[in-house]
Amino acid sequence: MLQPYKHEPFTDFTVEANRKAFEEALGLVEKELGKEYPLIINGERVTTEDKIQSWNPARKDQLVGSVSKANQDLAEKAIQSADEAFQTWRNVNPEERANILVKAAAIIRRRKHEFSAWLVHEAGKPWKEADADTAEAIDFLEYYARQMIELNRGKEILSRPGEQNRYFYTPMGVTVTISPWNFALAIMVGTAVAPIVTGNTVVLKPASTTPVVAAKFVEVLEDAGLPKGVINYVPGSGAEVGDYLVDHPKTSLITFTGSKDVGVRLYERAAVVRPGQNHLKRVIVEMGGKDTVVVDRDADLDLAAESILVSAFGFSGQKCSAGSRAVIHKDVYDEVLEKTVALAKNLTVGDPTNRDNYMGPVIDEKAFEKIMSYIEIGKKEGRLMTGGEGDSSTGFFIQPTIIADLDPEAVIMQEEIFGPVVAFSKANDFDHALEIANNTEYGLTGAVITRNRAHIEQAKREFHVGNLYFNRNCTGAIVGYHPFGGFKMSGTDSKAGGPDYLALHMQAKTVSEMY
């Protein structure tokens, strides 16, 4: 019997033994850099001439790994493999499926620093962020294992005399999982194992910038006893392989995390019924946000500045939950701005293998150029308070940037930047602050810093986001504690790490028997 779920503790790097263990893991992983990784289809290794090369964003000439690249023919084989495996996997006892997740969690826990070190090298994550990513991956495995056992009990419904009624859940079929690079382990793990533990089979297309850590995880599932064909690893082009998988008539479920533009396009494609398709596809998408930290007049201003800083600059702002907007009551605007700027100027930016660096690089050259172009727009729209500089000579580094005095309709107040940039805007009162906070097409996370109980209750009703936090940062959701997913163009409000998430991967069935 499984013990009650509790989240994986974060590593305390003030402890010397933990620091040494992590440094050793970084060294071990560095010796593994540059290796080749095959596709995995029906448990078989498939090597292709065409490769996806994964580069360290902090050392852009350092090859992390070379991964075989799938084409449409191989994507077809992966779909057929998943479809065949589904015929048996769907009937495996849910407790047995859950136990595979628990075993996988134990394997990653034993190799926790190793997986975090891969994230440092491949995704450019600083120690603390990489450690949290790995811990979240473990959490998804442990939490969903327990949730599946609970879900397998079904739901109680009524029966009449002489009639027995049951209501339970059944798997859907082949699932296409398209995972992002920013939580290259955690979100990839969560969106892959949720369909697996519910009895579906998976074709996994990881982000092309972080395919190596995904390959490492598929190996973990194999070691944990997952039968061949239940997960198929097919990195490839979104336009070629991604579209093919989404369009396929045997695809039953699609789970995607990424940009709004790609997510909306995927949603549209999935709605089309293809020749040979006898079902409507279900789509679970999480598409990002333009998230706001609201600071009230009576707030703790030091807490406000710290909350804005952590929300905006953790992992260089490359989180869908990042607080890229700060909306401050006019009476405390100048003081909060001054405090936040002072904190930002003390942040260190550099190679994330160095524990002393708070921020590492952004993910690649394309992201670097996009963020720098937004900063130039911001300089014209508002007042640059700190940062604004970038250096791509050895890696893709951008200084933490604060732009003040922005109109709520300004470009950098409206569009997702996905970088270390936070925009400040002034509110006349609390009603006005909430109005500004809600005036984007997104609705993912938000935070309110206030001591006013009436304003807390008002924000609960009126701040239209899926994850709302009070008197803390708007990032850092923990599986099982803060089910995660947003409104409007942030996605389908499918609450990852929540009690009803697994049911989205299944179909409810009612059985009525007379006796």
Swiss-Prot record:
Recorded catalytic activity of this chain's protein: L-glutamate 5-semialdehyde + NAD(+) + H2O = L-glutamate + NADH + 2 H(+)
Alphabetical list of SUPFAM superfamilies matching this protein: ALDH-like (SSF53720)
Pathway the protein acts in: Amino-acid degradation; L-proline degradation into L-glutamate; L-glutamate from L-proline: step 2/2
Gene3D superfamilies found in the cross-reference section: Aldehyde Dehydrogenase, Chain A, domain 1, Aldehyde Dehydrogenase, Chain A, domain 2
Superkingdom of the organism of origin: Bacteria
GO MF, any single term: 1-pyrroline-5-carboxylate dehydrogenase activity
Record carries keyword Oxidoreductase: yes
GO term, biological process aspect, one: proline catabolic process to glutamate
InterPro entries: Ald_DH/histidinol_DH, Ald_DH_C, Ald_DH_CS_CYS, Ald_DH_CS_GLU, Ald_DH_N, Aldehyde_DH_dom, Proline_metab_enzyme, RocA
EC class: oxidoreductase
Cellular component, GO annotation: cytoplasmic side of plasma membrane
UniProt keywords, alphabetically: NAD, Oxidoreductase
EC number from the UniProt entry: 1.2.1.88
Active site: 286, 320
Keyword hit for Cell inner membrane: no
Family assignment from sequence similarity: Belongs to the aldehyde dehydrogenase family. RocA subfamily.
NCBIfam families: D1pyr5carbox2 (TIGR01237), PRK03137.1 (NF002852)
Protein name as it appears in the record: 1-pyrroline-5-carboxylate dehydrogenase 1
Species for this entry: Halalkalibacterium halodurans (strain ATCC BAA-125 / DSM 18197 / FERM 7344 / JCM 9153 / C-125) (Bacillus halodurans)
